[in-house]
Every structure is written in structure tokens, then in C-alpha cells.
Amino acid sequence: MSGTFGYELDPRRLTADERAEMRAQIAEFRKYYRVIQAGEYDRLTDACAGGLTAWQHTAADKGEALVCVVTPPVRANAPFATVYPRRLDPDAEYEVNGRERRTGAALMYGGLPVPQEAEDWRAAQFHLVRV
């Protein structure tokens, strides 16, 4: 989730379930809008290197970050993937996706383990909020 967000379709042709899914997607985008539009953007990996692709939006005050990851096609016995956020306050504590807490230093140097998926091109997001 980055940049502009919208749909090019006729919503009158959608089912009730599809409209509900769209509402949920729009609500999620609005939740992160400020950090996506006004935050600092970092590429965390090289998208052309063949591995996972990751990028990050960070608020100017380092109080919030959104890390986005897209995994490559699944390989048998692939190594565990880790993504390393940037621009965090190393001394601050951050809540990851509203659950666990880690310091900025632990996140930047220890990284975030990327969930292993059984499908190609799966995406994951990590919402980091300073507490």
C-alpha cells in the first residue's frame, strides 16, 4: 500500500461482500494515510535482486512507520527472510502491529521476521507505533 489509492470500476456491479471488502480496504488506507503521504520513503530491499521486496514509510517525528513486504515465488526449503526497518528512534519502544513491543534498535538491527507463506507474491505489513 503506497501512493495514491482508488478503484476504477462501477461499484453498482459489485456484490454486497465485495463492497464490504472495499470498505475495509478504504478504512485501512485511511488509517495509514498520514504516514504514507507525508512520511519519509525508504526502499529496504532491491526489488530487482530476485528476493523479497520491502519498503517503508516513516513519520517525520519517527513515531510511526509502515513496513510493507512482498514475497517472491515460493521455493522449497527457502531460508527465513528478515526485513530491517530504518529511521526509527533506537532508544524508543515500538509496538509492532498492536501486539509485541521492541526497541527501535532491536527492530533496525535484529529485524522483523517475514511470515513464510505457501503462495507466491504474498504481502505483509508491519505497523510500528512508538509507545
List the predicted regions and their residue ranges.
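Active-site-proximal substrate-binding groove within the catalytic cores of carbohydrate-active enzymes
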Residues: 1-100, 104
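C-terminal beta-strand-rich structural cap/linker in extracellular carbohydrate-active enzymes
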Residues: 104-131
